[in-house]
């Protein structure tokens, strides 16, 4: 079989849940504060994937205004019971401190493209929910159980309860069926059944560099569950030089010809600081069932960079330059932050342009006008042309490399207090918890009050450089070289386990006067670049 290099979903695509229906494979991944919620990719061969749905796309399903960074949609589980698709997920409202507010929901659809139902509320006892359809027709709901008292630990275990689809609620007894191993932080549960065994796959160790997939089984769904003889069937925690780090939070799928694969999240750190700019990505491993009825990862437990898959991957689209215009609406590569009310933050135009409506400051947890796409390459270029006439320094719009409020670079068109237009750079560099900005060009660069401005950035590994050009002129540098590796999980806030998204590049607009000043963008270009600084393997 052809060998394919991991990851199969590059860029911010964590917590994969995989499903096969007939000849079709689907992977659902977390989207956190980015709207619409949940990404679902489709493949016929496990190698070539296409984004086909974002199910949580209207106000009656999802409104994340006020959700802090790295809250929102955590760890969706996608399943099919022979009649319809089921999607369970958490909409996290708070993650800091001892408490976590974690309402869990279910939506359903007959077709993967939708329409998806309005959500049914299930519980709030923890996160990472999963739905298991047993062969007797019963449905079982599992999630990790959170204990704010730490008696003995925050991650208390995996709780099981039956779900009644007719009543739309959990019924019957509830039990903590698995408390994990000494690695702790047990989460991400998925149940399976094979040869009379119930199998429980979980994640442990947190989503950083101690991450692992733990496997256990029982003859009874209620337990007790015995742990796999290897304990962790997938992990890179003891191999710091493996190309794929942070391996964990997996799910299992069988092919029609009987092969077994495990998908999992991974991170590819760059620089000596081990920073995952592209966030947590989705990788795949070949697995097999042993004579002892245990699952093993081929060449495991360390994840393989290259994996045998049923087909070769066509990387043509991955490396092609994307020039986006907006006459047909927002391209599916783009998302925005938190709000279902898009008419308040942007509109697409028949002439192909995109207009952003200035709202709150960049980094706001409520209503900011920011439209961006994932950075899916270690090195890339981004470019746009902006038409914007700000009145003062409280109105600004432009081009950004963005992770969260504590973690972004922003080249913006604004105005001095006397109304003269200027360009300036805002840098929020690992600024948690205060969120203070630095201005690499303290006095700004004054520009004419009339005319469009071309804005661009280049990223070459850890080096980010902004550029600008007035109409009829060539691009010129503005500001110093900035540290692009800052726009990463490791610098997004809580540096070990608390930042969960990935780097985006896009456009933004703010009007702190509250007058909804508009900025128009002619196009957006994303250009992948192959550069010697890119480290795909060590």
Curated annotation (Swiss-Prot):
Q: Would the keyword DNA damage turn up in this protein's UniProt record? A: no
Keyword line = Glycosidase, Hydrolase
Q: Which GO terms describe its molecular function?
A: xylan 1,4-beta-xylosidase activity
Q: Please name the CDD domains in this protein's record.
A: GH43_SXA-like
GO terms in the biological process aspect are: carbohydrate metabolic process
List its uses.
Combining xylanase Xyn11A and xylosidases Xyl43A and/or Xyl43B leads to the release of reducing sugars as high as 1.29 folds of the sum of that released by each enzyme, which contributes to the formulation of optimised enzyme mixtures for the efficient hydrolysis of plant biomass.
UniProt note: pH dependence: Optimum pH is 7.0.
Establish whether keyword Endoplasmic reticulum is in the entry: no
Fetch the InterPro entries from UniProt.
ConA-like_dom_sf (IPR013320), GH43_C2 (IPR041542), Glyco_hydro_43 (IPR006710), Glyco_hydro_beta-prop_sf (IPR023296), Glycosyl_Hydrlase_43 (IPR051795)
Q: Which SUPFAM superfamilies match?
A: Arabinanase/levansucrase/invertase, Concanavalin A-like lectins/glucanases
Catalysed reactions, semicolon-separated: Hydrolysis of (1->4)-beta-D-xylans, to remove successive D-xylose residues from the non-reducing termini; Hydrolysis of terminal non-reducing alpha-L-arabinofuranoside residues in alpha-L-arabinosides
Main EC class of this protein?
hydrolase
EC no. given is 3.2.1.37, 3.2.1.55
As for what it does, the entry says:
Bifunctional beta-xylosidase/alpha-L-arabinosidases with a low level of xylanase activity. Is most active on 4-nitrophenyl beta-D-xylopyranoside (pNPX) (defined as 100%), moderate on p-nitrophenyl-alpha-L-arabinofuranoside (pNPA) (56.6%), and weak on beechwood xylan (5.7%) and birchwood xylan (2.7%). Is able to attack xylooligosacchardies with degrees of polymerisation of 2-5, releasing the amounts of reducing sugars in the order of xylopentose > xylotetraose > xylotriose > xylobiose, i.e. the rate of xylose released from xylooligosacchardies increased with the chain length.
Q: Which family does it belong to?
A: Belongs to the glycosyl hydrolase 43 family.
- Listed name of the protein: Xylosidase/arabinosidase 43B
Q: Which organism is it from?
A: Humicola insolens
The major lineage groups are:
Eukaryota, Fungi, Dikarya, Ascomycota, Pezizomycotina
- Gene behind this chain? Xyl43B
